[in-house]
């Protein structure tokens, strides 16, 4: 019995080769899912690193701005994909569309809504691919378990056909079946961990972008209030002359 068991190839590749076609399909699917997980990890890690560093740099540069026009001049030196520049453009576009309106509070409210929608859209864009990670992390263990159950069923069928409980007959089939579960866990665990890492990074990135949006809204609010005060000064001066 021991010699027969030793002659059986129980390496990972050997177990795969001797596995049932259904179990093989399960293993291949799980391996592909793992490849997708790591591809998303490396691609999005580079994306997060570059985007976050760029946004931090732009935020520091915009901190010196004292008006929306000055912020726009600073943003002119940003890259074409600059999100900070897009937020500034949103505020300027709302000012252009609201020309002639004396309701400054309404302008601020509409600008805040536009900036909020832009930040939300960026968050959705940065979160692309996370759905795949969540799906892989959720279903991979069960897919692997399906392969295990199928493999064990085949092992029992083999026992019935050979009419023996010899370990050399039973062990290889069970090992092949358990390999499917192991591959399922190998696919699922990194997917869940990477998903949580990216979820935190997206939250942090959106918070930083929200700070930039608040800074843009602050500059616009200051400009509107200063313009309103400047427009009101001649009126107050005329009223004083009449009273005098």
Swiss-Prot record:
One of its GO terms (biological process) is bacteriocin transport. Residues 42-132, 199-244 are cytoplasmic. It is a multi-pass membrane protein. One of its GO terms (cellular component) is plasma membrane. The chain crosses the membrane at residues 21-41, 133-153, 178-198. InterPro entries: ExbB/TolQ_transport (IPR050790), MotA_ExbB_proton_chnl (IPR002898), TonB_ExbB_1 (IPR014164). The keyword Cell membrane applies. Its main location: membrane. Keywords: Bacteriocin transport, Cell inner membrane, Cell membrane, Membrane, Protein transport, Transmembrane, Transmembrane helix, Transport. One of its GO terms (molecular function) is transmembrane transporter activity. It is found in: Cell inner membrane. Involved in the TonB-dependent energy-dependent transport of various receptor-bound substrates. Protects ExbD from proteolytic degradation and functionally stabilizes TonB. This is Biopolymer transport protein ExbB. It comes from Salmonella typhimurium (strain LT2 / SGSC1412 / ATCC 700720). The lineage of its organism: Bacteria, Pseudomonadati, Pseudomonadota, Gammaproteobacteria, Enterobacterales.
